[in-house]
Amino acid sequence: MSSGYKPGKKRKVQPVQPIKKELVDFYGCQIPKEYEPYLQRTNVSLIIKKGFINGMKNDAEMFCNDDLFELLMNELLNEQPGASFSSCVRQTANVATLPGVIKSLAMPDAHSGYGFSIGGVAAMRLDDPNAVICPGGVGFDINCGVRLLRTNLDDKDIEPHLVELADALQKNIPSGVGTTSNQTLTEKEMNEIMNEGLEWLVKKDLAWKEDLVYCEENGRIINSDPHLVSQKARGRGRNQLGTLGSGNHYLEIQRVDEIMDMEAAKQMGISHIGQICIMIHCGSRGLGHQVCQDFVDLCVNQSNKNEVDIQLTGVPFQSDNGQKYFKAMNAAANYAFANRGMISYHVRCTFEQVFKKSPKDLDMHLVYDVCHNIAKEEIHLIDGNEIKCIVHRKGATRAFAPLNPVIPDAYKPIGQPAIIGGSMGTCSYMLVGTQEGMKKTFGSTCHGAGRKISRVKAMKDISSNSVVEEMKKKGIELRITDPKLAAEEADGAYKDVKEVVETCQSAGISKIVFKLKPLIVVKG
């Protein structure tokens, strides 16, 4: 670019003179003329052609409908040198320059993040010894994920207890920035949790054995090494097990609002409109954040920094440091599985307290638990050959096709469930993976609505009081630790989740099964 800066490189913001560029119309949007030869619009995506960024190994692809496409183009048009993050389009192209990359992708909910966009997917082929693993391609909240529990309650059963249940959930499940639980784990317990994940809770009778079956990786990633997790990271996680955190993390009590695929829904134990479910969205808390920070520092301080974007600096997967990060990341991921499991324990106990029935009698079974910030070793069919890859999913959900051997037997006929949370006060969705998704996205789909504006802009433009009042008008019981921050998570700060999941379905990468509507929202 004419300014001479390196796109995406994090640096101190300096005053810059606006750069005047010749603009052209591109499918109803204005873009700099220099980009036009490298962009191609399809009915479900934007193709970023090799050459948009110097060093791209191949084309990149961003899934979008017309409205989401317009957001991407406006962001690209208005990106400024000196910003902390590049535009989502540029970030997706930047990832296509990484060593060993097969393809860089962005899901419809994608928005700018550290290194990879949030919503980014990339697979690196492991028959290339230089193939990298990139902390910026996983994110700071390692194994941020979401789980759904079902019940045999209906909305009419829960309506008289909404206030009582909302108050009890807020009391029993700590939430908010830096929140701690009433339990401080010993060093031995920390090691066990980071090694065993959800299995540790099962041994302690804090989770059901069947929960393991309905959790991605059975709630435990085997190739982990807790001893690679720093004391600083351990200190941050020691008293946070069973806590929700802040930001877009939440616990929601939801009703089934619409069923699009009854056969698939029944396989998940969802039988009718009005059925009550519980959705939990959180990750590895401060422990995972510190693990990421430790290895970002290690990568950035090495001599071979990424020349396109320093935030994409990684290490060869097969190197000593690559394996250290991978195993420490997996240890943090196991902590996250246990964290969601511990919150589920408190949810089950709270329902028992309010409804005077045991969780078993209330049919509080786990439907599924998915990761959406993780890097995994997987085998994918590339140009007719089975290739072992390291697949980065950052703000993206694994959604494997029917009959895949790693998904539970009950779901083999329908494909892996993918749980998609909406913005605060809007609907959420259950999707399943498809064969087309295996071909197009390495078996990946979206993870949520995706931010439309930053938290800072949301706080400036949206009134938190109006958000709280709007939730009341919708009949939603909101429990938020700091109501002043409600604007950060306002519906207007996010894309339309309906458009996101429908775009995924139109692209053939996942299929919508049912929709959920919130009745209670608990946030930090």
UniProtKB/Swiss-Prot annotation:
GO terms for cellular component: nucleus; tRNA-splicing ligase complex. Mn(2+) 2 binds at residues 144, 281, 372. GMP binds at residues 248-252, 372-373, 421-424, 428, 447-450, 523. It catalyses: a 3'-end 3'-phospho-ribonucleotide-RNA + a 5'-end dephospho-ribonucleoside-RNA + GTP = a ribonucleotidyl-ribonucleotide-RNA + GMP + diphosphate; a 3'-end 2',3'-cyclophospho-ribonucleotide-RNA + a 5'-end dephospho-ribonucleoside-RNA + GTP + H2O = a ribonucleotidyl-ribonucleotide-RNA + GMP + diphosphate + H(+). Pfam families: RtcB. Mn(2+) 1 binds at residues 141, 144, 249. The active site is at residue 447. Its EC number is 6.5.1.8. It comes from the Eukaryota. InterPro entries: RtcB, RtcB-like_sf, RtcB_euk. One of its GO terms (biological process) is tRNA splicing, via endonucleolytic cleavage and ligation. SUPFAM superfamilies: Hypothetical protein PH1602. Its cofactor is Mn(2+). Keywords: GTP-binding, Ligase, Manganese, Metal-binding, Nucleotide-binding, tRNA processing. GO terms for molecular function: GTP binding; metal ion binding; RNA ligase (ATP) activity; RNA ligase (GTP) activity. Binds 2 manganese ions per subunit. The keyword Ligase applies. Catalytic component of the tRNA-splicing ligase complex. Catalytic subunit of the tRNA-splicing ligase complex that acts by directly joining spliced tRNA halves to mature-sized tRNAs by incorporating the precursor-derived splice junction phosphate into the mature tRNA as a canonical 3',5'-phosphodiester. May act as an RNA ligase with broad substrate specificity, and may function toward other RNAs. Belongs to the RtcB family. Ligation probably proceeds through 3 nucleotidyl transfer steps, with 2',3'-cyclic phosphate termini being hydrolyzed to 3'-P termini in a step that precedes 3'-P activation with GMP. In the first nucleotidyl transfer step, RTCB reacts with GTP to form a covalent RTCB-histidine-GMP intermediate with release of PPi; in the second step, the GMP moiety is transferred to the RNA 3'-P; in the third step, the 5'-OH from the opposite RNA strand attacks the activated 3'-P to form a 3',5'-phosphodiester bond and release GMP. This is RNA-splicing ligase RtcB homolog 2. It comes from Entamoeba dispar (strain ATCC PRA-260 / SAW760).
